[in-house]
Amino acid sequence: MAAASPVCGSQASAVGASSPPAPAPAPAAGLGRCRMALLLAVALDVAGMAALLTGVFAQLQVRGRDFGDLLIYSGALLVFLSLLGWILWYTGNIEISRQELERDYGLRPSAIARLARKLSRRWSAPATASPRTTAGLRSARRANRAPQPSSSGSRRVRLQLATLEAGSVAAGTGSE
């Protein structure tokens, strides 16, 4: 979420960065660090509730058409969209120490990581091989995947689609 960083400010540098450990951030006072996200959430809540309550209690008619439902639905939509602001504000105020980040997300050898590296190397090996070797591997895979014809007399049919022209359809002839 690169768009969230200007709203909430930078909280910490990357875990693998070689910078000296930064001092612990000061506790957030009052509204927290993400004041713009909080302002967005509160503004959307106020506008949504105003539209929703106006749609419920006011009799809005223009040229005999009732617009109460429009205000109810748009107010509910604004209140729902305010959840984005609340989520940004809440997640922007979570404080995690560098030690906790390194403990939870540090590079530790695990069986899953080894398996992922092994599969990645195996799948990327044909891509780095020469084109002739890669073509040979592809044809070998196709031969293994191709269904074997059964002895019941079935045969393989090749279907080719071609565009039909208006003149050839009317005349009953077509190029095949």
From Swiss-Prot:
InterPro entries for the chain: TMEM238
Stretches that traverse the bilayer: 37-57, 70-90
Chain residue ranges for the region called Disordered: 1-21, 124-156
Cytoplasmic side stretches: 1-36, 91-176
Localization of this protein: Membrane
Major location category of this protein: membrane
Chain positions with Phosphoserine modification: 175
An example Gene Ontology CC term for this record: membrane
Protein's membrane topology: Multi-pass membrane protein
Extent of Low complexity compositional bias: 9-19, 124-135
Chain ranges on the Extracellular side, renumbered to this chain: 58-69
Keywords for this protein: Membrane, Phosphoprotein, Transmembrane, Transmembrane helix
UniProt feature coiled coil, ranges: none
Name recorded for this polypeptide: Transmembrane protein 238
Source organism of the structure: Mus musculus (Mouse)
